[in-house]
């Protein structure tokens, strides 16, 4: 990714950058962005945007589960060392991870990272089981983390609204598995995490001024994903849904689906909301919401 950013001639990167420049959000969650320890690729990406667009002085990313090796067979194919044997799918550590670009600083001493939470430690976890027992094995479930990428709670200090808490994740697609429905169950529980978080299961949830956003990889009405978790989240009494029912991505063979969400807390006033669809950049749209108090 860094090589392609620095070369400056990758058509997809050019389209992504142009979309960001034209939209000019104050805070941006970037999904599917490769992580590196020094943040070199993210810095180069932000500098590329700043040439003709907003200056994102804050570039934030935590180590993801994507590509984090386990040395176990995590997908039940009898082999180890494959991309699905990592804590989250990845051909290398940091493959297709998450990042935040912001005009405003992150309150780093208040960041909460739940990426290391074991799947089995989620309340009422829906772990995969077959006739032979836990899938793919007891040993795998003993170390399997819930997050395929991460679950972050990140306060951002704004000049006029004070601290705004971002709650973000990128759930695994509920496909590419077998009859045990490992990915479908994990997708469901990655979404259910936020319901538990807002109920205070892990720490005191934010009282006000928060936004839950990310790629949940689950449409409430279409596709293979288990629907109870995403429907419950969209109906949560502390959240509002400014883009209710609007598809956010287009998939070959499936058509338009709603899998990306920006859900502000109910104490916000939603000034406007919308999507920017740029097929050359991504099959996912850029989702935006303009908020005030």
Regions flagged by a language model, labelled:
Residues 10-14, 134-156, 189-202:
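A Trp-anchored, charged/polar loop motif used as the substrate-binding/catalytic surface
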Residues 36-42, 69-71, 175-178, 219-225:
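Extracytoplasmic/secreted cell-surface and envelope-processing proteins
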């Amino acid at each position: 990714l860094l090589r392609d950013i620095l070369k400056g001639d990758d058509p997809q990167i050019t389209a992504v950058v142009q979309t960001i420049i034209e939209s000019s959000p104050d805070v941006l969650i970037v999904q599917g962005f490769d992580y590196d320890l020094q943040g070199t690729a993210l810095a180069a990406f932000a500098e590329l945007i700043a040439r003709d667009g907003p200056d994102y002085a804050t570039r934030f990313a935590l180590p993801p589960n994507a590509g984090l090796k386990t040395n176990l067979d995590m997908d039940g194919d009898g082999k180890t060392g494959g991309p699905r044997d990592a804590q989250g799918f990845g051909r290398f550590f940091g493959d297709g991870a998450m990042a935040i670009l912001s005009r405003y600083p992150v309150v780093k001493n208040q960041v909460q990272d739940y990426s290391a939470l074991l799947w089995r430690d989620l309340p009422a976890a829906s772990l995969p089981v077959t006739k032979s027992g836990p899938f793919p094995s007891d040993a795998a479930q003993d170390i399997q983390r819930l997050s395929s990428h991460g679950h972050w709670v990140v306060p951002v200090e704004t000049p006029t609204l004070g601290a705004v808490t971002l709650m973000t994740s990128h759930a695994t697609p509920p496909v590419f598995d077998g009859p045990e429905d490992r990915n479908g169950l994990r997708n469901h529980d990655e979404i259910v995490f936020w319901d538990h978080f807002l109920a205070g299961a892990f720490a005191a949830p934010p009282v006000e001024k928060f936004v839950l956003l990310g790629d949940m990889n689950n449409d409430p009405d279409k596709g293979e994903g288990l629907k109870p978790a995403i429907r419950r989240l969209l109906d949560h009494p502390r959240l509002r849904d400014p883009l209710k029912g609007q598809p956010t991505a287009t998939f070959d063979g499936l058509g338009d689906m709603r899998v990306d969400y920006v859900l502000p807390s109910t104490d916000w006033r939603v000034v406007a909301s919308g999507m920017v669809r740029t097929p050359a950049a991504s099959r996912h749209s850029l989702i935006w919401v303009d908020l005030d108090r």
